[in-house]
Amino acid sequence: MDSTNLDSELFIEFKSRGKRCQLFYISDSHSEGLYEIVSIERERLAMWLPWVEDMKSIENERAFIKYAREKMERNELFMLTICVNQKPVGMIDIHNIDLQKHQAEIGYWISEKYENQGFVKQGLKKLIKIIPSKFKIDKLLIYIDVDNVKSKFIPISLGFKKEIEISQFEFYNGSYHDFEIYGLNVNERNIANGKSEIFTNKEQSEYFNFPHCLSSCKS
């Protein structure tokens, strides 16, 4: 993997529980690392993520990344690769950006090896503080399968509130799944504090001067 290329697309860097984590703008250079996780952890990820079934080759991953970057260039999506020591371990994103309703949805996933280490929570915490001003977003939503207990911890720990439960919201793995929707009014947010040290010292405006300032997890 070309670490020089990754460095050129760094969004933010922070520390969580003593480990250094980077969020990079999604790039083709991440495709092999991301697909390796999907390939190894396919059964686990497919329990909650319908797109895993369609991710059958490295070519599929590269095609998705190309699609994502095109949407980001149109400010329809904002997707980041979670890296630990520049190794891809997962993704977070803001998708379904609705400028009329001033709201958007958040998606995320991470390798089992890196769960429960604060990378997703701290990454989203940084993202939530920055992104709303760019997209004029007032409301963020997270949709979660009612049985995905680990995933529910993320919005709750960040101050999101459960707004509604929808029966038979999605069909995958041969059955219907009920979902819970968690919401956060970003102008009134009270994001829970977490131990995290930011290394990248830039003003918000600098974050969006990246030449391909792209605006999902695969949703």
Task: Briefly describe each language-model feature range.
Residues S39-R42, E53, R69:
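Residue-level detector of secondary-structure transition/capping positions
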Residues A46-K66:
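Conserved GNAT-fold acetyl-CoA-binding loop/helix
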